[in-house]
Amino acid sequence: MEIAINRLNADKDLEVFHDLDVNYVDTSKTAGPRAARTAALNNATVAAMGLMRDCYIQSTILNINLKIAVSDVCEMDLSSVKGFDQTSVLMNSQTNSLAKSVMYFLDKYQWKKVALVSPSAVLTAFAARVRSDLLDALTANKIDILVDSRLDPMSDITEKVKEDAEKARIFIICDWSSNANLLRNYIFKLGEMNKMQSGEYFVLGYISYDTNYQWLEASSGDQRLVHLGASDINDYNLTENDLHEVYKNVVILSDGPPPAEPNSTWEDIKTQVLKKKPAKMCPPYCNTTISEKITPRWDRIKLLFDSIQYLADATNDALNIGANIYQSDIFYEHLISRKVDSVTGVTEYIDGYGAIVGSMQIYYHFSSSSHNSYSLFPCARLAQSSLLNTVWSLTDYSEGLSIDFVNKSAPKDTPVCGFYGENCGPPANNTFIIVISVGVAVLIGLAIAAAFLYKRYRYERRLHSLFFMIDRNQIILKKHTNLMSQQSLRSMASIHGSVVAASQTLRDSHFFIEDYNNASSINASSIFNTGSTARAGPFGPIPGFGGVTGASEDEKWHQIPDFGVGLYEGRTVALKRIYRSDVEFTRSNRLEIAKLQESVNSNVIEFVGMVVQSPDVFVVYELAQRGSLKDILDNDDMPLDDVFRSQMTKDIIAGLEYLHSSPVGCHGRLKSTNCLIDARWMVRLSSFGLRELRGEETWQQEDDVQEGKDQLWTSPELLRWSTGLSQCGVLLVQKSDVYSLAIVLYELFGRLGPWGDEPMEPREIVSLVKREALAGKKPFRPDMAVLKESPRIVQETVVAAWTEDPLNRPSLHQIKRKLKPLTIGLKRTIMDNMVSMIEKYTDKLEKDIAERNEELEAEKAKSEALLKMMLPEVVADSLKLGSNVSAESFENCTVFFSDCPGFVEMSATSKPIDIVQFLNDLYTVFDRIIDQFDVYKVETIADAYMVASGLPVPNGNHHAGEIASLGLALLKAVESFKIRHLPNEKVRLRIGMNSGPCVAGVVGLKMPRYCLFGDTVNTASRMESNGIPLRINCSGTAKEILDQLGGYEIEERGIVEMKGKGKQMTYFVRGENSDMRRERIIRERVKFASLKKAQIQEKTYEFS
């Protein structure tokens, strides 16, 4: 206690709480100890500490005396007083700490079935509540308690452990006994039965620190541990290695203080306590003999220091804000729901009921040689992470909790087959199982073999049946012109220029395709690579196939040039001639055709079949409606942007990737004329496969100029290959495809043909490509200057892809990854990109429209506000609806006029700008005041201010009262009004009011005004002009209405001669009773809606 008090006196942070002293009261040897304790508690001024375990009576005494009770060992249950005014604070661990810790592990490992083991001895009240809280938590979380054993730790529990082990896998052992005999015995028995070593069992143990602190503290000096000792396993059939395996599936929980950590404060306190230990503890234990061998209760010492520091911090906080600490209900608010910084270095919390939240220490075994082989070491702490976050979490020490399960994973709470084998069938005879298994395996093998043979048979039969052959009578030939006419290409020229142009292009293209599908002729030479023109038939030059009157079917097919178009099974197909008079379909040919028919991908042209009727041989393909990539590149009216080029590049690479991974294996003839464009503007590769059939073609070039033109995209190694493409390996052709891809990219981004502006003839270019490298010269390639405006990654890719050595060329995957920046954000096809562009434009347009609508609404609101400032709201609403606003008669209303006597003289002696500022300031004040009344401001002319009530919305007889109350408010306001340029002058406001019938209506087209007409208006004006400054001159008719309303003080002025009116009896309105007006308005608001805007004044205005 003295050490703790000395620490507080030395704490400079405690600004108003210092110079403490200790008042000890030892009642252990006095007569009537209970009476002495009661007297001591009654003498407490603010708080008392050091209450006993059963502190109910002591806390009650302090509660009755409105004093604070701070206990570090009290075990009473505050649940019975929660919700009532109380003054008790409990600093020891709570009974639900074990339940929260156990639920942490059960939730973490999803254990839903457990066994609960505890001593059979009578429990203390505190231990009983701990067990009760644990049972409640297990029930609330739907945890099945398979076993609930209450055992004598000193008896033989072998049979009971064996019985429990057959019913459960996860054990919760709560041991409140000294030396934890039940926990040791139970764990070692499970180990002796080889249950723990199997990894299927787990023990979550609890040791009461209160009954085991001596051996827990004495085990290892500063580093407290759970020491089970070598001698403990002598009576069991266990080795040290067995013990290590057992410990892997054991976690121990304890409610003691944290173990020693590198905490200078706690270490200093321990040193001071140990130095003081041999001395006689007087005070306070002057009548008691203290053993020098007693083990210090570090948990009690920790709680004592924490309690004193906690009470000091709370008192200091209360005094700093001026709180009265002698008033317990106020001081108690500073004690609850606050953080407690323990001297051990951890953080704890006091809840809203004055009880500490508590925590739980975790012990686990480590196999490190630096640790005792028989001990479990403190590795973590379970506690609440903050005052508001009630979920418990781990606070790691230097070791940290890492459970090394026997089987490397947490055991299941239920065996695979259940505890009684209910989840598995009965055991079967092994011989029978083996025979059945072998039989089933043989049958499955035979079935697989039969299925394979049947599939093979069907495949061979299909190959033999020439499934791909098409009877030419099933194809209807069509005339052809130019598929992609100049007009169509021009309509596509602005495909990426703007969204509007793109939309128009879609409509144009759709119309063209429909025309074509209906009947228009078509030029198939724009679909596949060309090499010759239409041949002359027996009837002379043929302008188009199928167009010669009287020609036979054979003649029509024989007159088809390199390419044709027809209708097959309801769809348009392309016909490509193979220059062979006949074809003998060998097995290898049929296999190659089968691979072609299996190659289906969105980036390759579909193979439909073949037409073979000597001497004509055609391959039937799916038709690409928009021609080839070369057609587009050769058309100067077709602008190409980066999106177009990037999408085309993406499609070409995707098609090649598919072919290289498909049974076809390669392309072999990649060029821009074989990159076809379909209706969705997607590139689809054609003219691949059939290498053996096409390798034997016999047609010749038309002239020398065209010779070598089809070989401008071919790689050097294939040009040198004398045996033809059909004899090349797939890998070599794949590398050749990479070279051809480079030429296509050069053509696509340069747009000057496959070899740019090279002036040589194609056959000369092919010859140089084929021979230059062999002669030791630099390989001949297109001029890279053509691509100077292209992206750098494209230039680098082209150069790498047309490298002379095929093995040094990049793979398609590498090329795709290199060019990925070009395709980021692109859709699947160009058409999808166009749709995306339209959608973005639409979204932007909708956003712009919404913004314009918001601006329009804002301006509309301003216009309406301005209109309502010029005209009454009901009149303005009628005008907005287009209704005619006719003049309206009002049976009764009150008109108000006011002016400022002396205004003319002021105007003569003041600057015009000063007069303007004066009137603006005055009327601004007036306008703010009239908003509080059910009145309408008609107009202002110079210093004259005109207001009316009872129109345009009638309000019964309240119009006279609203005008009178307004006049009183204005007179009150001018008392404090300052004239800027004449600060010493006062505004002497003169007011006149009159009630009676009136006619009102809108007058004029330009700057229309709501005007009032009638004798009532004239009389009100005379009342104002014949009035007295700072007075409200009231007519007799207005006075009668005010008398009916009540609450107004009216003084008779007398008869006044008025111009045009003769003699009139007049009155002064002197004041009002605001309570009567309030009651009147509240009562009549439902009847007269216009009264809702009238604000009730809290003051009564009176003038003498």
UniProtKB/Swiss-Prot annotation:
ATP binds at A534, R535, A536, G537, P538, F539, G540, P541, I542, K576. It comes from the Eukaryota. Residues 1-431 are extracellular. GO terms for cellular component: plasma membrane. GO terms for biological process: cGMP biosynthetic process; intracellular signal transduction; receptor guanylyl cyclase signaling pathway. Residues 894-1024 form the Guanylate cyclase domain. Residues 528-823 form the Protein kinase domain. InterPro entries: A/G_cyclase, A/G_cyclase_CS, ANF_lig-bd_rcpt, Cyclic_nucleotide_synthase, Kinase-like_dom_sf, Nucleotide_cyclase, Peripla_BP_I, Prot_kinase_dom. Gene3D superfamilies: 3.40.50.2300, Nucleotide cyclase (3.30.70.1230), Transferase(Phosphotransferase) domain 1 (1.10.510.10). It is found in: Cell membrane. GO terms for molecular function: ATP binding; guanylate cyclase activity; peptide receptor activity; protein kinase activity. The keyword Coiled coil applies. It is a single-pass type I membrane protein. Residues 453-1104 are cytoplasmic. Its main location: membrane. Keywords: ATP-binding, Cell membrane, cGMP biosynthesis, Coiled coil, Glycoprotein, Lyase, Membrane, Nucleotide-binding, Receptor, Transmembrane, Transmembrane helix. The chain crosses the membrane at residues 432-452. Guanylate cyclase involved in the production of the second messenger cGMP. Belongs to the adenylyl cyclase class-4/guanylyl cyclase family. The protein kinase domain is predicted to be catalytically inactive. This is Receptor-type guanylate cyclase gcy-15. It comes from Caenorhabditis elegans. The lineage of its organism: Eukaryota, Metazoa, Ecdysozoa, Nematoda, Chromadorea.
